[in-house]
């Protein structure tokens, strides 16, 4: 579970949509199973499938609950849309998240719509985070605000900031412009649950303040745990600035990457047969390397796992 990473374009992170908690978690799980480095993904490459047991394990729920949750969330998801606005031009895009789903006795297959592909593949400005940090959120707005705050921190190249947003803009982003006219109700049902989720389950610490009489501005005092290695560019810069030594490893990055490329190529040409875990893990490692240009973001556990797999097939 800790290896699943969500990649999203910045535009998608601040888009307008209204999904339930379970619909949001289903989407994030599916996004984390994609390979974001693929160019011009085919229908097969934008298709995600997993068993109900796998989903239950990923989300820490029972197998029986997994089927019911997935069935309801998937049916509703087929009717949901996402709205993306370009601040530089008037107008906006509206499209579906997915356009096909298939249930069998053991697994779910879901296909992302073609219109959403530019916001999930070949990304230039994007956010990324471990699915582990949001899977336990209890409020549907918590995941939205987590992504928005992460985008702001990433753009500012910092792990700590006071991020301001007008109350109207905040409600517009969450499609709440016609709800919670009294601030105390918004605070009770939206802001406090968001703070509780982020402070309890995620790698963010959050305090929400307000300004104005009546309130017209929200101030999010947010701090990202730098040890979680989610903002890779920031981490690399801080290591250089602080003069910290990068832990030495037996296998150099270039040697490790060459071994990774050979292994994936040999698997593609059927010279070797990877297990499902190995195939997903190596594909994820290649995706992250392509996006970051190095393996400096690897945890020791990830590096050891990668080295063991490559050594198993004689590629290092």
From Swiss-Prot:
The Swiss-Prot or TrEMBL record annotates one GO molecular function as: DNA-directed DNA polymerase activity
Q: Which residues form the signal peptide?
A: none
User: Mind listing the UniProt keywords for this protein, alphabetically?
Assistant: DNA replication, Plasmid
Gene3D superfamilies annotated for this entry? Winged helix-like DNA-binding domain superfamily/Winged helix DNA-binding domain (1.10.10.10)
- Gene Ontology biological-process entries: DNA replication initiation
UniProt superkingdom: Bacteria
Q: Tell me which InterPro entries the record gives.
A: Initiator_Rep_WH1, WH-like_DNA-bd_sf, WH_DNA-bd_sf
**Does 4Fe-4S show up as a keyword for this record?**
no
Pfam families cross-referenced by the UniProt entry: Rep3_C (PF21205), Rep3_N (PF01051)
Q: What is this protein called?
A: Replication initiation protein
Q: Which organism is it from?
A: Escherichia coli
């Amino acid at each position: 579970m800790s290896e699943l990473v969500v990649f999203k374009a910045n535009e998608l992170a601040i888009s307008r949509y209204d999904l339930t908690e379970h619909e949001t978690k289903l989407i994030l799980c599916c996004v984390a199973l994609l390979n974001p480095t693929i160019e011009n993904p085919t229908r097969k490459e934008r298709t995600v499938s997993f068993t109900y047991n796998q989903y239950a394990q990923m989300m820490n729920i029972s197998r029986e609950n997994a089927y019911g949750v997935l069935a309801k969330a998937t049916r509703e998801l087929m009717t949901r849309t996402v709205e993306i606005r370009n601040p530089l031009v008037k107008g906006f895009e509206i499209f579906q998240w997915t356009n096909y789903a298939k249930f069998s006795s053991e697994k779910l297959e879901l296909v992302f719509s073609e219109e959403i592909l530019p916001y999930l593949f070949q990304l230039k400005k994007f956010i990324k985070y471990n699915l582990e940090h949001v899977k336990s959120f209890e409020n549907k707005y918590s995941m939205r605000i987590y992504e928005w705050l992460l985008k702001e921190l990433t753009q500012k190249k910092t792990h700590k900031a006071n991020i301001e947003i007008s109350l109207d803009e905040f409600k517009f982003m969450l499609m709440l412009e016609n709800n919670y006219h009294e601030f105390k109700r918004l605070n009770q049902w939206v802001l406090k649950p968001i703070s509780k989720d982020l402070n309890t389950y995620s790698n963010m610490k959050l305090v929400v303040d307000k300004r104005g009489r009546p309130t017209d501005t929200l101030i999010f005092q947010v701090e990202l745990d730098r040890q979680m290695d989610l903002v890779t560019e920031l981490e690399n810069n801080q290591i250089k600035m602080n003069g910290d030594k990068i832990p030495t490893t037996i296998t150099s990055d270039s040697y490790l990457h060459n071994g990774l490329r050979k292994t994936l190529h040999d698997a593609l040409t059927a010279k070797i047969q990877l297990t499902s875990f190995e195939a997903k893990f190596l594909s994820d490692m290649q995706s992250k390397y392509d996006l970051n240009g190095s393996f400096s973001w690897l945890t020791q556990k990830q590096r050891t796992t990668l080295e063991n797999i490559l050594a198993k097939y004689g590629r290092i």
